[in-house]
Swiss-Prot record:
GO terms for biological process: acetate biosynthetic process; acetyl-CoA biosynthetic process. The keyword Acyltransferase applies. Gene3D superfamilies: 3.40.50.10950, Isocitrate/Isopropylmalate dehydrogenase-like. It is found in: Cytoplasm. It comes from Clostridium acetobutylicum (strain ATCC 824 / DSM 792 / JCM 1419 / IAM 19013 / LMG 5710 / NBRC 13948 / NRRL B-527 / VKM B-1787 / 2291 / W). Pathway: Metabolic intermediate biosynthesis; acetyl-CoA biosynthesis; acetyl-CoA from acetate: step 2/2. It comes from the Bacteria. GO terms for molecular function: phosphate acetyltransferase activity. This is Phosphate acetyltransferase. Its EC number is 2.3.1.8.
Amino acid sequence: MDLIESIWECAKQDKKRIILAEGEEKRNLIAADKIIKEGLAELVLVGDENKIKEKASELNLDISKAEIMDPETSLKTETYARDFYELRKHKGMTIEKSEKMVRDPLYFATMALKDGYVDGMVSGAVHTTGDLLRPGLQIIKTAPGVKIVSGFFVMIIPDCDYGEEGLLLFADCAVNPNPTSDELADIAITTAETARKLCNVEPKVAMLSFSTMGSAKGEMVDKVKNAVEITKKFRPDLAIDGELQLDAAIDSEVAALKAPSSNVAGNANVLVFPDLQTGNIGYKLVQRFAKAKAIGPICQGFAKPINDLSRGCSSEDIVNVVAITVVQAQRGI
């Protein structure tokens, strides 16, 4: 059983209620039909009820078991406006502005998550990552002990021996443009825990660079080296090393030459990139050239599960992210 099959089976065992903030969007509706048929989650769709039902009918989809919530007519909107005002009044929020903001589908969905009405939230087929993160950070905030929210991809690479038989986690590929050493350490620790709890693999974390163990010098290299030291200080139990070039991180023969004393080099299954440019480009290179399945971006670090989608996602991608969100809710990831 591969990872996706395992996640699906786990999701079915203890279904959670997931809210799709972009309920009127075609790919979300196709995904909703599949999710309901497979029994992966209980769904709430945000949007105009008539539009959603009309589109579903046109596409010959059965979403009758999904709840539809329209922020313009929902009985919860007034409560959410009042609660959001209380959360943000110290930042200058007014009740009038709050009433307007919670009618935005993303803010409405995030308040439903805060309220406990749903267990997880998925968005991003239409909206940007920033659109999703803003209400998430304002309303849900980060989990205890976590400094920043970050995003990772589960990469499943066919006919590949690297990582866990072709399975690797890439971070941060979605959120933080230029993380500091402290932030990189936080990303490494959070992604390692995610690898263990979500993917059931023992994490071996490589902090990537264009340098391996001092082969190059400079501020960019120092940032990664410092992140490794910070991580080891707070989590000496984690298998983590760096700075490592990609080939040294995943190829045992290269590792034997470049980093022979490393306990991670050649066997890494979690790759932490030094910044968002390298992370985002890196996952897309592997996805396109190696025909890899890229599942994500999955957000980590929120107090409750909130997940992003690529605007280029397929309905299948949405199904998988919803299943992962269910498992995150089950396991408190």
